């Protein structure tokens, strides 16, 4: 335990605190402006200097109830923001309309409050939804296509899996990869207009099919889902993928330290690639967010996967999400 100061609260040390303290000492984010709400570079440039010294976020998907593993992330993100004079945003990753429900949104809000945290700072709420940014994300997707950095792929899921390669074998280019930006833009707009069925095409980034990091082998950015969204209704039939959604949402919200669990460590190069690419196109104000990973909480002999917990509920193995054998925060 170390003595307290403005930049060094009396808290046990860990690498995230060291990163934040280094950034505060260097003034990494001291000159960033905040437009009062999420937005692009021009929006934030018109605002005052950001009064929050750091910005973190907790980003659950509203497809089930939170469990004790999420409590670690909640306490970490909200606690770091509190200890360093910052703000933690609560953002719902609501990009999969087939599995998300308002019931889970309400329960997650209640659970975060139950743990003693809030996203209201100075009379301003920092409760957001990824779906708030669908228009912006689509604009970014069209920009990538126009720059020759994304393309529409009509291969089947099996074909894409076969050409992706593995850890020992490089991937091979899709036959759709060589199309012109104009051709890809027309196909993307057809996707958006609902002219294709579910699974008929995806939008992929054009990076490097021979990359040793499989997540850089032309990852999917958008997929087609004709499903009613809990917030946007039937406005959209294409939805952004997780790896496309999070860096853009972080940048729009001016997050400084994007803290997530270790399974996303090898996704970080794409996170950095996307923000660097879009920043070069003046989408975002510099410096952009940085991603950091921590070890997730696991309990011996306890199922901690939300997907598996959902399967247990739906198959009747347990009586419900509030079954006392479940690790949920209900």
Stretches with model-predicted labels:
Residues 18, 106, 110, 269-273:
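Residues on a specific face of well-ordered alpha-helices
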Residues 104-131, 140-143, 148-151:
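A glycine-rich helix N-cap at a beta->alpha junction
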Residues 11-21, 28-106, 228-261:
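N-terminal catalytic cores of NTP/NDP-binding nucleotidyl/phosphoryl-transfer enzymes
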Residues 90, 96, 102, 129, ...:
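Active-site cores that bind ATP or allylic diphosphates and position pyrophosphate for catalysis
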Residues 26, 79-87, 111-122, 251, ...:
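Secondary-structure transition/capping motifs at alpha-helix termini
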Residues 86-89, 116-121, 246-256, 287-290, ...:
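Short acidic (Asp/Glu) and glycine-rich catalytic loops that position anionic groups and cofactors
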Residues 296-322, 326-330:
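Substrate/cofactor-recognition hotspot
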Residues 1-11:
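Basic/polar N-terminal segments that are highly enriched at the extreme N-terminus
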